[in-house]
Amino acid sequence: MKVNKKFLRNIFFLFFILLVSSCIQKDSDSNQDSSPAYKNPDLDVEQRVDDLLSRMTIEEKIGQMVQFVGMNHLKRSEKFLSIEELKKSDASGFYPNLHSSQIPDAIKSGSVGSFLHVLDVAEANFLQKHAENSRLGIPLIIGIDAIHGNAMVRGTTVYPAPLAMASSWNTELVEQASIETASEMRATGSHWTFAPNIDLARDARWGRVGETFGEDTHLVGEMGVAMVRGLQQGDFSSRNAV
């Protein structure tokens, strides 16, 4: 039987083209997985969010709504926990059936998305490192009560309480203090403060009157806006904004 060499050559060439195309497609798929859209800072926010949500499991979405106190709080409670507190499960920084040693695994599994009152940068970096090693690498949100300065963290600047700030009627001073507060928060690993408190202080029996700007609606509004301007610094593009 005589073999048509031209026919065989064409078959071989076609096979070679298909093989190369397959390799290119596999390489393209691999690149897409290693650099997903939600990690691309050049894309718009909505596109990145949509891509991330499409990849998240329901457990990971729930995890983003879970917040624990910082590990140092947990360790302190574990060390000094009384029998009475253990019975009532009401100790500060205590969670039944959760030990501080389990926190890294909770982060890596996507079971927690936020921490409260992380009081030093070493702890913040420790927690974020475990978040980097999670399946999707979603950073943790770290919040703190920076009501009048980042005062819960040792060595930071403490400003007068908001009620005293309001007595100055100086919104520029309040804004500048808030800028400095945001800077010190970011330097210690926090991104979120539970301030300002813009409730109206109408009942002196309330325990958080000192965290407000008083009872006057106009003054509270002006001071609240000034504090927000200082903390957010516009569009959050500043590395020191919170």
Annotate the PLM regions.
Residues 23-242:
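Glycoside hydrolase catalytic-domain context in secreted enzymes
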Residues 2-12:
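Bacterial N-terminal signal peptides that target proteins for export
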Residues 11-21:
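Bacterial N-terminal signal peptides
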